[in-house]
């Protein structure tokens, strides 16, 4: 079965959740109907996700085969004083993630970024090996641009099943999206809610969002506020539905149960004329990371 038919459209993102929050939100999300839970070794909350999954399984809310669990290996970034992971390092990272998650396999394993310029292909070969031995069902990447993906092609290796990238109306990445679609690489969008005025407001939640962007998001004349009023939905639901209509999988993150419902339970269609208006909102590159856009890594 291809990832396109297997991966749920809406999943739970767990970035910046504590282990305790990850446990609670994983459990509550599964109870609501979520089946995709996304974590990573660098989130340091895989054990919390594991407890949420365990609780859901023990209560009979879901079976393991009904869940789609994603985790990620961080490749190592020499600019941050880290060595680039080798083939064996990646194999070990997956084993450690499986232990923390208390799982025999994960549905999707991603190389978290393209920072390992010397060992990118070696790392990708490790994921293909893990896929062949059944420890992962699908192999993918995150934050890889066309050049990075072309390296895989040039090595005569199969392309990733998916690429998880920052995607929202302010960062639409049309060239990369077209490349992924043309090459049958499924698109997972993260940071879908960047344009909201409420996005990342806590201390330490820094990004490249400018004051002008903040003002635009807060304005009553914001296109997303106007469309939310038109369709009688939440502003966040406009942003999520935009992605779903473009066939992107999404991973909205929240630590509020009410928002878990909002991010999952909505049913409306954005009219084509409004989709075109949203298309005009593109501002260019990524905004999520204070240190820069990972798609610009060499």
List each model region and its residues:
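Active-site groove signature of glycoside hydrolases
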Residues: 101-118
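Active-site mouth loops of central-metabolism enzymes
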Residues: 9-20, 73-87
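N-terminal binding-site loop/beta-alpha segment at the start of enzyme catalytic domains
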Residues: 1-67, 193-196, 295-297
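Beta/alpha (TIM)-barrel catalytic core signal, keyed to glycine-rich beta->alpha loops juxtaposed to Asp/Glu
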Residues: 114-298
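Short acidic/polar active-site loop segments enriched in Thr and Asp
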Residues: 35, 104-107, 137, 161
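A short, structured active-site edge motif that brings together acidic residues
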Residues: 63-78, 108-109, 143, 167
């Amino acid at each position: 079965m291809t990832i396109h038919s297997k991966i749920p459209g809406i999943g739970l993102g767990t970035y910046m959740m504590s282990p305790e929050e990850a446990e609670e939100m994983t459990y509550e999300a599964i109870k609501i109907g979520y089946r995709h839970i996304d974590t990573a070794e660098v989130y340091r909350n895989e054990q919390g996700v594991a407890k949420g999954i365990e609780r859901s399984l023990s209560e009979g809310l879901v079976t393991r085969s009904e869940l789609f669990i994603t985790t990620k290996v961080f490749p190592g970034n020499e600019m941050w004083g880290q060595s680039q992971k080798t083939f064996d390092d990646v194999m070990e990272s997956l084993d450690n993630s499986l232990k923390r998650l208390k799982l025999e396999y994960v549905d999707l394993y991603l190389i978290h970024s393209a920072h390992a310029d010397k060992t990118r292909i070696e790392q990708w070969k490790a994921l293909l090996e893990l896929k062949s031995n059944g420890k992962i069902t699908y192999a993918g990447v995150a934050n890889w641009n066309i050049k990075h993906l072309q390296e895989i092609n040039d090595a005569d290796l199969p392309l990733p099943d998916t690429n998880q990238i920052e995607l929202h109306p302010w960062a639409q990445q049309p060239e990369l999206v077209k490349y992924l679609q043309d090459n049958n690489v499924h698109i997972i969008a993260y940071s879908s809610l960047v344009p909201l005025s409420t996005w990342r407001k806590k201390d330490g939640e820094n990004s490249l969002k400018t004051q002008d962007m903040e003002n635009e998001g807060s304005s009553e004349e914001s296109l997303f506020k106007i469309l939310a009023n038109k369709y009688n939905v939440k502003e966040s639901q406009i942003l999520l539905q935009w992605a779903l209509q473009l066939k992107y999988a999404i991973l909205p993150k929240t630590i509020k149960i009410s928002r878990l419902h909002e991010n999952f339970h909505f049913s409306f269609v954005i009219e084509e004329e409004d989709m075109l208006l949203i298309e005009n909102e593109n501002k260019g590159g990524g905004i999520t990371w204070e240190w820069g856009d990972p798609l610009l890594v060499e």
